[in-house]
Amino acid sequence: MRNIVFHDKTKTFHLYNEKISYIMCVLENGHMGQIYFGKKIHDKEDFSYLVEKIERPMTSYIYEWDKSFSLEHIRQEYPVYGTTDYRHPAIELLQKNGSRISEFKYTGYEITKGKPKLQGLPAIYAESEEEAVTLRIYLRDSLTGIILELLY
């Protein structure tokens, strides 16, 4: 993506080029959620109307007072094992104590010029820093201290 915008008030990221938009945000529980991927749309500060929040019977809720917020039905950017989302996780870590439960929450981001090389992984490349912009999103599990770094 050539353009990356972060809206601090809504904690929303909008990545876009001439044809497509990719929008994600920090959810109310600190996880990253995917809001939109498709035809380019105009940037705005608040895309929360695109997050589907409705009550569903027989599902797991994060908050007792909010039966419209369920990780089982929200598109997460990087879902993990054991957080009431029963779909396949993006990562499952076996910890020393035998637990596989992680909860990676947003801690920050960084936008830099260029495209870093990923050792041992297939990736596109950029000839110069002006050809690309990279977004790094940092997620941290508070119990283990492990930090995930997502690159876009």
Q: Where in the sequence are the language-model features?
A:
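N-terminal accessory beta-strand-rich subdomains and adjacent acidic, glycine-rich linkers
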Residues: 1-152
